[in-house]
């Protein structure tokens, strides 16, 4: 983040990269469902995790993560508002979040990047940040331009590959790290399977 933004109100946009290939990397129904669920929830869960683990109990009410709550829709922009972070929208692997200053945003960005990698093993999050103005329309236009610029120059990080003596997953090519359903899987596959509801798998397979 640019240093001049650290003390200013900012709008951040988060974009999960590689969603399609992540979800449909395998034909296993359980992994496809699990991957879809992980992608749908990853940003909001990451922000909730930050508030829970990095924000003091006294300040948690100043971090608004529930963007569906109409009662707090304009909480950040009200006069004399003390809200430090407010999620404005989440969907389709994207999220728009307002921060009272860039320093808070920077801390969240570092946490979220690590969280996404730990929970999905191979997805990346692109982050664009601009100074907030009084024009939401103009801010939306600028943040999307900035995101396109960021993504055009952002290398896609991948986990360390397998050594020649390490067994690998036949689908992903990643190192085998555990067993599920009596089969060997890499970390990415295990995380997908761990997030799925068995009842949903049964419903799909019955159709």
Set out the residue ranges of the language-model regions.
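Regulatory and interdomain segments flanking nucleotide-handling catalytic cores
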Residues: 1-207
């Amino acid at each position: 983040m640019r240093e001049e933004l650290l003390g200013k109100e900012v709008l951040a946009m988060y974009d999960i990269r590689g969603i399609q290939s992540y979800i449909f990397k395998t034909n296993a129904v359980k992994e496809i469902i699990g991957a879809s669920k992980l992608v749908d929830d990853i940003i909001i869960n990451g922000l909730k995790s930050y508030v829970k683990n990095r924000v003091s109990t006294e300040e948690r009410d100043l971090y608004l993560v529930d963007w569906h709550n109409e009662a707090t829709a304009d909480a950040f922009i009200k006069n004399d508002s003390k809200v430090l972070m407010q999620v404005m929208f989440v969907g389709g692997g994207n999220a728009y979040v307002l921060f009272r200053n860039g320093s808070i945003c920077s801390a969240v960005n570092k946490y979220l990047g690590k969280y996404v990698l730990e929970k999905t093993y191979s997805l990346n999050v692109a982050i664009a940040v601009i100074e907030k103005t009084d024009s939401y329309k103009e801010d939306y236009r600028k943040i999307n331009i900035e995101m396109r610029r960021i993504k055009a120059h952002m290398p896609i990080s991948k986990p360390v590959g397998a050594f020649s003596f390490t067994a690998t997953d036949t689908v992903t090519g990643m190192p085998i790290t555990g067993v599920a359903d009596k089969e060997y899987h890499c970390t990415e596959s295990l995380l997908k399977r761990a997030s799925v509801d068995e009842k949903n798998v049964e419903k799909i397979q019955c159709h």
